């Protein structure tokens, strides 16, 4: 990996964009084995980049772009053995320039308070963790390798280090999921908030904000769950409603927020994840019908996509709800 070419002069947009930052890939692949994850399977083996190469690349990218933020990118940043060294280097090198460091892929069981405390010294931000499921049974099914104690201990370290905002990512519609698993998302988020309020009041930084987000499970090819059946769109919406109601019943509900991915978009993700060359015709037909900027909610028109499938004769249900598509 250290011998491969890395873009030192990425294009800088002349307008304000969402991902307005330099991106530094610190390693490729993942040492974990989550059963839903395509990237963790197809990018094996894990290949870390040389620390000296990363330092020179970061220095060049920030000089050439003028960005005020750099993201240390990988499938699991906290599994990079020299993470603390690269973070310390970036802080020492660019502290006076106010460069923010983003660590988007942290495992809560590998949370390093020392590393994150250094990051906070530059500019405070929220922390994001991905328990993926609300109960231990469901996490075992997907081989997440996280216990509730891991989650609460990691969150506790973050709170004691001064953070008050935590984002938690979950998935709905996983194989064998029960109502207890769905409601467990709200219960776990509440336990995380409760962990914050266990800190003496004079040592807290005001109230905490726990934001839980759920996407809907899409079976990915080349993953162990590639042949699992997707749930109908209406079922995804029903399950999100169950979780939302569970959040309303939690003790610390004022500190909790919940949102979920658009079910219609999930259906399309499932089609393109599991489809063969025939879905290329659907994509072209959707474009001809005017589906151009559909990544933005205000432009997304599900009816046009349904029309595209009808016009091309591609059966969505066959791709989504059977294992022999």
Where are these regions (language model features)?
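Short acidic (Asp/Glu) and glycine-rich catalytic loops that position anionic groups and cofactors
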Residues: 5, 31-39, 63-71, 133-136, ...
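Conserved small/polar residues in nucleotide/adenosyl-binding loops
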Residues: 321-325
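N-terminal [4Fe-4S]-dependent radical SAM core
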Residues: 1-23
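Canonical Radical SAM [4Fe-4S] cluster-binding loop centered on the CxxxCxxC motif
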Residues: 15-52
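Radical SAM enzyme [4Fe-4S]-AdoMet core and its adjacent flexible, acidic
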Residues: 214-260, 265-294
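Conserved SAM/AdoMet-binding glycine-rich loop
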Residues: 59-211, 215, 219
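Short glycine-enriched, charge-decorated loop/helix-capping segments at active-site entrances
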Residues: 41, 141-146, 226-232
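Sequence-structural signature of the catalytic-core scaffold of metal-dependent phosphohydrolases
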Residues: 292-313
């Amino acid at each position: 990996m250290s011998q491969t070419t890395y873009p030192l002069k990425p294009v800088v947009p002349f307008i304000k964009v969402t991902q307005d930052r330099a991106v530094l890939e610190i390693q490729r692949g993942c040492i974990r084995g989550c059963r839903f994850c395509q990237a963790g399977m197809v990018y094996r083996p894990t290949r870390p980049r040389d620390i000296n190469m990363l330092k020179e690349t970061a220095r060049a990218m920030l000089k050439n772009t003028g960005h005020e933020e750099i993201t240390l990118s990988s499938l699991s940043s906290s599994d990079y053995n020299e993470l603390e060294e690269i973070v310390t280097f970036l802080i020492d090198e660019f502290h006076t320039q106010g460069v923010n460091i983003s660590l988007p892929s942290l495992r809560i069981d590998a949370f390093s308070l020392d590393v994150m405390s250094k990051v906070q010294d530059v500019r405070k931000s929220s922390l994001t963790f991905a328990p993926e499921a609300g109960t231990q049974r469901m996490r075992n099914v997907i081989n997440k390798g996280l216990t509730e104690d891991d989650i609460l201990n990691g969150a506790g370290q973050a709170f004691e280090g001064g953070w008050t905002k935590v984002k938690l990512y979950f998935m709905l519609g996983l194989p064998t999921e029960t109502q207890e698993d769905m409601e467990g998302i709200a219960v776990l988020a509440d336990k995380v908030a409760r962990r914050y309020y266990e800190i003496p009041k004079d040592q807290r930084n005001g109230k905490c904000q726990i934001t839980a987000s759920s996407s809907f499970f899409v079976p990915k090819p080349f993953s162990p769950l590639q042949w699992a059946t997707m749930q109908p769109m209406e079922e995804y919406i029903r399950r999100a409603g169950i979780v939302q109601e569970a959040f309303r019943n939690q003790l610390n509900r004022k500190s909790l927020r919940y949102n979920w991915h658009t079910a219609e978009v999930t259906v399309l993700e499932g089609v393109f994840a599991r489809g063969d060359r025939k879905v290329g015709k659907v994509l072209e037909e959707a474009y001809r019908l005017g589906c151009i900027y559909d990544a933005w909610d205000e432009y997304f028109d599900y009816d046009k996509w349904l029309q595209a499938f009808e016009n091309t004769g591609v059966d969505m249900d066959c791709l989504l709800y059977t294992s022999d598509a």
